Amino acid sequence: MNVYEKNTVEFVTVGVEFCAFVEKASEKSFDTFVPVLQKLLPFLYLKAAMVEKPMPLGEDELGTFVTEVDYETIRVAMSNILEEKDDFYNGEESTSISECVADVYQDIKDCISNYKTGQEDVMNDAIERCIDNFQTYWGT
Protein backbone atom coordinates (compact mmCIF):
# COMPACT_ATOMS: atom_id res chain seq x y z
CA MET A 1 0.00 0.00 0.00
CA ASN A 2 1.12 3.53 -0.74
CA VAL A 3 0.96 5.50 2.53
CA TYR A 4 0.52 8.67 0.47
CA GLU A 5 -2.58 7.40 -1.32
CA LYS A 6 -5.33 10.04 -1.55
CA ASN A 7 -7.83 8.37 0.81
CA THR A 8 -5.13 7.71 3.40
CA VAL A 9 -3.86 11.30 3.35
CA GLU A 10 -7.43 12.62 3.61
CA PHE A 11 -8.12 10.31 6.58
CA VAL A 12 -4.96 11.49 8.35
CA THR A 13 -5.85 15.12 7.60
CA VAL A 14 -9.32 14.77 9.12
CA GLY A 15 -7.77 12.85 12.03
CA VAL A 16 -5.43 15.76 12.74
CA GLU A 17 -8.39 18.17 12.75
CA PHE A 18 -10.44 15.86 14.98
CA CYS A 19 -7.62 15.53 17.53
CA ALA A 20 -6.92 19.26 17.56
CA PHE A 21 -10.60 19.97 18.17
CA VAL A 22 -10.99 17.39 20.96
CA GLU A 23 -7.77 18.57 22.64
CA LYS A 24 -9.35 22.02 23.03
CA ALA A 25 -12.62 20.69 24.48
CA SER A 26 -11.98 22.33 27.85
CA GLU A 27 -12.15 25.73 26.11
CA LYS A 28 -15.57 25.05 24.60
CA SER A 29 -19.16 25.23 25.73
CA PHE A 30 -21.87 22.71 24.92
CA ASP A 31 -23.17 24.95 22.13
CA THR A 32 -19.76 25.30 20.48
CA PHE A 33 -18.54 21.75 21.06
CA VAL A 34 -21.43 19.46 20.18
CA PRO A 35 -22.42 20.87 16.75
CA VAL A 36 -18.83 20.61 15.50
CA LEU A 37 -18.36 17.13 16.96
CA GLN A 38 -21.60 16.05 15.25
CA LYS A 39 -20.00 17.01 11.94
CA LEU A 40 -16.45 15.80 12.60
CA LEU A 41 -17.33 12.27 13.73
CA PRO A 42 -19.30 11.27 10.61
CA PHE A 43 -16.61 12.87 8.43
CA LEU A 44 -13.90 10.91 10.25
CA TYR A 45 -16.00 7.74 9.87
CA LEU A 46 -16.41 8.35 6.13
CA LYS A 47 -12.69 8.97 5.63
CA ALA A 48 -11.76 5.86 7.66
CA ALA A 49 -14.22 3.76 5.65
CA MET A 50 -12.56 4.89 2.41
CA VAL A 51 -9.07 3.73 3.43
CA GLU A 52 -7.98 0.35 2.15
CA LYS A 53 -6.53 -1.54 5.12
CA PRO A 54 -2.88 -2.29 4.37
CA MET A 55 -0.98 -5.43 5.28
CA PRO A 56 1.33 -4.91 8.28
CA LEU A 57 4.99 -4.48 7.32
CA GLY A 58 7.02 -3.76 10.41
CA GLU A 59 8.04 -5.98 13.22
CA ASP A 60 8.67 -3.13 15.63
CA GLU A 61 6.09 -2.01 18.15
CA LEU A 62 4.30 1.19 17.20
CA GLY A 63 4.69 4.21 19.44
CA THR A 64 1.99 5.03 21.97
CA PHE A 65 1.56 8.77 22.32
CA VAL A 66 -1.61 9.15 24.41
CA THR A 67 -0.95 8.61 28.11
CA GLU A 68 -3.59 7.70 30.69
CA VAL A 69 -3.40 11.29 31.94
CA ASP A 70 -3.98 12.63 28.41
CA TYR A 71 -6.91 10.26 27.90
CA GLU A 72 -8.51 11.15 31.22
CA THR A 73 -8.02 14.88 30.67
CA ILE A 74 -9.79 14.64 27.30
CA ARG A 75 -12.57 12.43 28.70
CA VAL A 76 -13.24 14.65 31.71
CA ALA A 77 -13.26 17.83 29.59
CA MET A 78 -15.91 16.34 27.31
CA SER A 79 -17.88 14.92 30.23
CA ASN A 80 -17.96 18.38 31.82
CA ILE A 81 -19.34 19.83 28.59
CA LEU A 82 -21.96 17.12 28.07
CA GLU A 83 -22.98 16.86 31.75
CA GLU A 84 -26.21 14.84 32.10
CA LYS A 85 -26.30 14.19 28.34
CA ASP A 86 -23.04 12.20 28.53
CA ASP A 87 -24.34 8.82 29.73
CA PHE A 88 -26.18 6.34 27.54
CA TYR A 89 -27.09 2.66 27.44
CA ASN A 90 -25.68 0.79 24.44
CA GLY A 91 -27.90 -2.27 24.80
CA GLU A 92 -25.42 -4.17 26.94
CA GLU A 93 -24.08 -1.69 29.47
CA SER A 94 -24.10 1.91 30.54
CA THR A 95 -21.34 4.00 29.00
CA SER A 96 -20.68 7.61 28.07
CA ILE A 97 -20.21 9.65 24.94
CA SER A 98 -17.08 11.20 26.44
CA GLU A 99 -15.51 7.77 26.97
CA CYS A 100 -16.37 6.60 23.45
CA VAL A 101 -14.99 9.78 21.86
CA ALA A 102 -11.86 9.58 24.05
CA ASP A 103 -11.34 6.00 22.82
CA VAL A 104 -11.52 7.18 19.22
CA TYR A 105 -9.24 10.12 20.04
CA GLN A 106 -6.61 7.80 21.52
CA ASP A 107 -6.66 5.57 18.45
CA ILE A 108 -6.51 8.47 15.98
CA LYS A 109 -3.86 10.42 17.92
CA ASP A 110 -1.57 7.40 18.17
CA CYS A 111 -2.09 6.72 14.46
CA ILE A 112 -1.35 10.24 13.24
CA SER A 113 1.60 10.61 15.62
CA ASN A 114 3.14 7.43 14.20
CA TYR A 115 2.25 8.60 10.68
CA LYS A 116 4.11 11.88 11.26
CA THR A 117 7.39 9.99 11.77
CA GLY A 118 7.75 9.79 8.00
CA GLN A 119 8.97 6.19 8.19
CA GLU A 120 6.85 4.38 5.63
CA ASP A 121 6.75 1.03 7.44
CA VAL A 122 5.65 2.78 10.66
CA MET A 123 3.14 4.91 8.74
CA ASN A 124 1.75 1.80 7.04
CA ASP A 125 1.42 -0.14 10.28
CA ALA A 126 -0.16 2.82 12.09
CA ILE A 127 -2.83 3.02 9.38
CA GLU A 128 -3.28 -0.76 9.47
CA ARG A 129 -3.83 -0.76 13.25
CA CYS A 130 -6.16 2.22 13.19
CA ILE A 131 -8.29 0.85 10.35
CA ASP A 132 -8.38 -2.55 12.07
CA ASN A 133 -9.63 -0.88 15.27
CA PHE A 134 -12.12 1.13 13.20
CA GLN A 135 -13.47 -2.05 11.60
CA THR A 136 -13.49 -3.95 14.90
CA TYR A 137 -14.48 -1.40 17.54
CA TRP A 138 -15.34 2.22 16.98
CA GLY A 139 -16.54 2.10 13.38
CA THR A 140 -19.05 -0.72 13.80
Where are these regions (language model features)?
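Residue-level recognition of alpha-helical structural elements
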Residues: N7, S29, F33, I97, ...
